[in-house]
UniProtKB/Swiss-Prot annotation:
InterPro entries: FAD-linked_oxidoreductase-like, Fadh2_euk, Mehydrof_redctse-like, MTHFR_C. It catalyses: (6S)-5-methyl-5,6,7,8-tetrahydrofolate + NADP(+) = (6R)-5,10-methylene-5,6,7,8-tetrahydrofolate + NADPH + H(+). The lineage of its organism: Eukaryota, Metazoa, Ecdysozoa, Nematoda, Chromadorea. Belongs to the methylenetetrahydrofolate reductase family. This is Probable methylenetetrahydrofolate reductase (NADPH). Pathway: One-carbon metabolism; tetrahydrofolate interconversion. SUPFAM superfamilies: FAD-linked oxidoreductase (SSF51730).
Length: 663
């Protein structure tokens, strides 16, 4: 190898592995394919509302749901303290939001340097990441007591630039040891007025309500009148401070309605998750915990599990009462960045509604103000959606309906932060457990790919649930089962597969393996394969395609620095590889192959070899040398079989290339 002086990686083609059949028939749906394997977790449900729509402002969505008498929930989070905690945090937000959260919000945490958009863990940066990567409408808390008007307007402009269109306007807590007269003395009412004066109706504005009155207000009645002033100034809805008794919220709502507050009032609920934590939070909020709750907690205060069980059950009981009697249109849960008990509460209340539909083969960001109309993506980022979002973050519009004849798609660079910190796998140790602490030869590399496809444990008993080119630790996609035998064959023969899809000819849109879109439709796919292979094999492959399949098979082969770059596709014409036909709709083509986008993907695909694998080993080690040799010597190749109605020839073409190379 290049780094160790050993034989080159390409000698792996010495012995060609065989299987009974490389041909794969077009898939027509699980009901007609007796060989299709469907996991129990896959459902046959499809989307009721599947097409992209114009963005609906948060307060408009809340009002619509209330008018339709649909109960809903929302979730509050605070920013993670450390950069390496961001991936786990975003995963947690995404998992919880998949239960149907109408919105999530992010606190204005002064310790995070909240307005610093250059700091990964700031409130502003995390809110933008929640919106972009989790695809759920995100409201940013914003305080003004520490700032002047110019500062606050700057913060609002930053929020607008990041795509955020919902603000929870707050005065904010005074810094410890600070009196109100020592600050700028601006309050939430001032911010609400500034927003409406400067931005009109661009933002949805939430404001805080205090069911027992703000602790610094002259009186409960005075605080109610101040809340009415905030609503009259332009606040669209109210989210309350935490409380401990259902009666407290019920009285508060009655009192608000009596003085003419008509905006939706959403109860803010904090489940008791720990004895000391709830006492600390109550003290910070200047609230008294009812004596009967303290009495209940006293005998179990040292048993964390018992306290959490009590808190969960009490929360469910209180929320159910408020929802059943119609006082609360929804529930806003203060999650404290926890997941388990929050999910249990929502399921018990019947609010958890796991979405079973796929609007597109990739996750549609229907609640994103800008991406909500996006309907087409290049296939290369199928398993790295966060990367795609990062690299297209600065786009002010997204392809809708068709990718079009592109001349220069402006993909941003993947920053070193993204490469190292926004991945899903926790750390190098986890990855090495999957890939192997020692890579002695190319055979070890092939085995990693094979174990990923088969999901068989490796020699150390660890499953390979992720590759450098995938973000989610979920293993292969369900549709991979249709071609898994052929993919294993590829990797056994040194053709390292990183992306693929089988041909599909009119599978129902409700199909559990490949279905997407509106019910009553039909889905189609061209067979696609993306892989790394030796230069010699790619040369032979190109010869065979140009000789025997010049029209049927499109290829694109490229090396790490583009000194080799060859394709038989039109340079600026994309190829639709996934499309659907649905009742009353235009044909949708959500996934394409595009030569110019592929060149942008090439940089990232090669970087992943080292950033997410090779660099975990010492540079002088054999393991590093093996990975570096593959990175340096192998070409990245894509193949498209344009005839989706006949058995795919992609694997047969690869077999021919291997056979001719062997001669």
């Amino acid at each position: 190898m290049t780094n160790t002086g050993e034989t080159k990686v390409i000698e792996s083609h010495g012995t060609i592995k065989k299987i009974d059949s490389l041909s794969t028939m077009p898939y027509c749906g699980v009901e007609t394919d007796e060989n299709a394997v469907v996991e129990e977790k896959i459902t046959l449900e499809s989307g009721k509302s599947w097409s992209p729509k114009h963005y609906e402002l948060l307060h408009e969505r809340i009002e619509r749901l209330i008018d339709e008498k649909q109960q809903f929930f929302s979730l509050e989070f605070f920013p993670p303290r450390f950069v390496n905690g961001v991936p786990n945090f975003l995963e947690r937000v995404e998992r919880l939001s998949e239960g149907g959260s109408v919105f999530v919000d992010m606190t204005w945490h002064m310790g995070s340097d909240p307005a610093n958009v250059d700091k990964v863990t700031s409130s502003s940066s995390i809110a933008a990441s929640m919106l972009d990567y989790c695809g759920v409408d995100t409201m940013l808390h914003m305080t003004c007591v520490q700032y002047n008007k110019a500062d606050t307007l700057k913060h609002l402009e930053q929020a607008k630039a990041m795509g955020l269109r919902s603000i929870l306007a707050l005065r904010g807590d005074l810094p410890p040891g600070t009196e109100l007269e020592d600050t700028h003395q601006f309050r939430a009412l001032d911010m609400i007025r500034w927003i409406r004066e400067e931005y009109g109706n661009y933002f949805s504005i939430g404001c805080a309500g205090y069911p027992l009155g703000h602790p610094q207000a002259p009186s409960y009645k005075a605080d109610l009148m101040y809340l009415k002033a905030k609503c009259d100034a332009g606040a669209n809805f109210v989210i309350t401070q935490l409380f401990f008794e259902a009666e407290t919220f019920e009285k508060f709502v009655r009192d608000c309605r009596e003085i003419g507050i008509t905006q939706p009032i959403i109860p803010g609920i904090m489940p008791i998750m720990g004895y000391e934590s709830i006492k600390r939070i109550a003290k910070l909020s200047q609230l008294e915990i009812p004596q009967h709750i303290l009495d209940d907690l006293e005998p179990i205060k040292h048993d964390d599990d018992a306290v959490q069980k009590y808190g969960t059950e009490r929360c469910i009981e209180m929320c159910r009462r408020l929802l059943d009697n119609g006082t609360a249109p929804s529930i806003h849960l203060y999650t404290m960045n926890r997941e388990g008990s929050i999910r249990e509460i929502l399921k018990s209340l019947g609010l958890w509604k796991l979405e079973g539909d796929r609007v597109f083969p990739w996750k549609n960001r229907s609640q994103h103000p800008i991406r909500c109309l996006e309907s087409v993506r290049p296939i290369y980022w199928s398993f790295r959606p966060r990367s795609y979002i990062t690299r297209t973050r600065d786009w002010d519009q997204f392809p809708n309906g068709r990718w079009g004849n592109s001349s220069s798609p402006a993909f941003g660079d993947v920053s070193s932060y993204y490469l190292s910190n926004l991945t899903t796998v926790r750390n190098a140790d986890d990855r090495l457990a999957m890939f192997g602490a020692n890579i002695e030869s190319f055979e070890d590399v092939k085995r990693v790919f094979i174990n990923y496809i088969t999901q068989a444990p490796n020699a150390d008993g660890v499953k390979v649930t992720v590759l450098p080119w995938t973000e989610a630790e979920t293993g292969v996609q369900p549709e991979t089962s249709l071609i898994s035998e052929q993919l294993v064959w590829c990797n056994e023969n040194g053709i390292l597969t990183v992306n693929s899809q089988p041909s599909v000819n009119g599978a129902p849109s409700t199909d559990p393996l490949v279905g997407w879109g509106k019910p009553g439709g039909y889905c189609y796919q061209k067979a696609y394969l993306e892989c790394f292979m030796t230069a010699e094999l790619s040369d032979k492959l190109i010869q065979i395609i140009e000789r025997e399949f010049p029209v049927r098979v499109n290829y694109h082969a490229i090396n790490k620095d583009s000194t080799f770059d060859k394709t038989n596709s039109e340079e600026t014409t994309p190829i639709a590889v996934t499309w659907g036909v649905f009742p009353g709709s235009e044909i949708a083509q959500p996934t394409v192959v595009d030569p110019l986008s592929f060149r942008a993907w090439r940089d990232e695909a090669y970087q992943m070899w080292m950033a997410q694998w090779g660099d975990f080993y010492p540079k002088e080690s054999k393991s590093y040398g093996v990975i570096k040799a593959v990175h340096d010597e192998f070409r990245l190749v894509t193949l498209v079989d344009n005839d989706f109605q006949k058995p795919s020839v992609l694997f047969d073409v690869l077999q021919k290339a291997l056979d001719e190379l062997k001669k």
